[in-house]
Amino acid sequence: MTDKPHQCVIIGIAGASASGKSLIASTLYRELCYQVGDEHIGIISEGSYYKDQSGMTMTERVKTNYDHPSAMDHSLLFQYIQMLKAGLPIEMPVYSYVEHTRRPETLHLRPKKVIILEEILLLTDLRLRQEMNLSIFVDTPLDICLMRRMKRDVNERGRSMDSVIGEYQRTVRPMFLQFIEPSKQYADIIVPRGGKNRIAIDILKAKISQFFE
């Protein structure tokens, strides 16, 4: 954890795909909004910063390894974090997991006291780590992550079960072992058992609440 001015506090939450990190992030966001007001806290998904692939065919898009750091536009995310810290609003990209590229619209986000970042590859990027006041890794067994991912991608993203399993074998698991799991060493706090670990959520909420004092 680095000592940063508290004008804009950055909380990073990483972990395997379907580990429960998004649930933890959304729970913290919802409960802290109730506590301090939504004008003081925001949330950003690294998944919004997949690179724009509008110039590629759908066949080319589906071949992208979305679990590799090169699929992410971390430079844009880093730039936007710096803008928020400078008191400037940003226009967040909106990514379509069905079309595998960015949508034309953006989401307006004003600077907040606390910004929660969440997604799989956040801790693999040194620039992003250096901007974080608190870094968290959600540590969930891979077999549980796979079951959750299958349910999510089939029901919410229009994927077939065969394609989800194939992608898991080709890229998700290998990239987790190569990039995501090693990034756990950079976390200030490791949360076991995913998004339903209520004790961990309460501890994190108490820690983040200190930044509002």
From Swiss-Prot:
Pathway: Pyrimidine metabolism; CTP biosynthesis via salvage pathway; CTP from cytidine: step 1/3; Pyrimidine metabolism; UMP biosynthesis via salvage pathway; UMP from uridine: step 1/1. Its main location: cytoplasm. GO terms for molecular function: ATP binding; cytidine kinase activity; uridine kinase activity. It is found in: Cytoplasm. SUPFAM superfamilies: P-loop containing nucleoside triphosphate hydrolases (SSF52540). It comes from the Bacteria. Keywords: ATP-binding, Cytoplasm, Kinase, Nucleotide-binding, Transferase. The keyword Nucleotide-binding applies. It is an enzyme of class 2 (transferase). Its EC number is 2.7.1.48. One of its GO terms (cellular component) is cytoplasm. GO terms for biological process: CTP salvage; UMP salvage. ATP binds at G15, A16, S17, A18, S19, G20, K21, S22. The keyword Cytoplasm applies. It catalyses: uridine + ATP = UMP + ADP + H(+); cytidine + ATP = CMP + ADP + H(+). Belongs to the uridine kinase family. This is Uridine kinase. It comes from Sodalis glossinidius (strain morsitans).
